[in-house]
Amino acid sequence: MFTSHFSASAVTAAAILSTFANGLPTSLVSKVKRGDSLKFNFGSEKIRGVNTGGWFVLEPWITPSIFEATPSNVVDEYTFCQTLGKTEAESRLQQHWSTWITESDFAEMASIGLNFVRIPIGYWSVSPLPGDPYVQGAYEYLGEALNWAQSNNLMVMIDLHGAPGSQNGFDNSGRRGPIDWTQGNTIAQTHTALNKIRDDYASHPAVAAIELVNEPLGPDLDMDTVRQFYMDGWGDLEDSHVAITFHDAFEGVNSWNDWGSGMWALMEDTHHYEVFDSGSLQMSLSEHISTACSFGASMATNNKWTVAGEWTGAMTDCAQWLNGRGVGARYDGTYNYNGESSSYIGSCDGKYSGTVAGLSQADHNNIKSFINAQMQAFEDAAGWIFWCWKNEAAPEWHFQNLTAAGMVPQPLSSANGCSS
């Protein structure tokens, strides 16, 4: 999840490069024939999914209880393992992995009409590096999760969420702080992890997509290096019968149309949040909806399948530690990180830590309308994957509970929030 410290407007200037009917872009038809054994009808069948955020890659805001039991310097999975030591860290993480999401969650996902699950995992769980403090074990649970998905007719995108050196400096990369991905041997090490995922799991009947790396922070990276990494990653996976998924690197949802010629089965992943800059946080409900609907229309002009691989019902950044442990929220003026602060916009009461049931009726109605609009908007393109399925205390981000509360359209195909 794009959490924190890269302040970019949620509104991407969309260049309308081409127009085509919903479904498979004409420019992709011939390319897909080379990989004609894809396991999902991307484009013609809409992706409707959720992320299992916080399961195999810790995030303080998703499971604050895990971090509250540690000193305040523990801000990510790296410092969690480093501070506790491998024996204690493994004990706590084994308990978390085995209980946070279970087969019953996958059954419930299927029962409400979802057809896709994006499962984030860090390189350290796949191909650990000497000297890393991380502990292993999540990779085996990933294999079990794929079987659960298959049993419930769900397709899976395996998402390499954390790369060696950190590709964005966010806590959700495993290590908050400097961005050292692309330095030294980190690119080669990332390919090693991806190739192991390919060899172990690409042939699994439930695996329909593999994402090369989550949210590389393009403005802070050499984009020629990122593009070459994507090309080489595609080359490693091209015959694996999966959609080879790449994130837009915050370069703009329409910025990749001139890239990827001759590469089949490519899917672009774009993440749409309207909470990580003060301009977005000050928008009215109608402005939030208009922004999302316009973004979906921009997605639909791409010449590659484009999925909103992360999005949320939130219109505030109030959730405890959403921007990082100890950082605060822009919305209520408590944000303070690396010299950046914020001014008060509104109260975080009921949203800092709480439940869907505890939301005000106004919040209930507004979030419901925002979700309804985004679901329709993103289905103008390849579809959507909500962030995230569950969390401990962030009601705007809890798809399971939002659905139970009647705030997600049922059936999912009935979303119409951009139609009025």
Where are the regions that the model predicts?
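Fungal secretory targeting signals
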Residues: 1-31
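Active-site-adjacent substrate/metal-binding segments within catalytic domains
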Residues: 54, 58-136, 384
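Aromatic- and acidic-residue-enriched segments that line the glycan-binding/catalytic groove
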Residues: 60-75, 133-137, 165-182, 322-333, ...
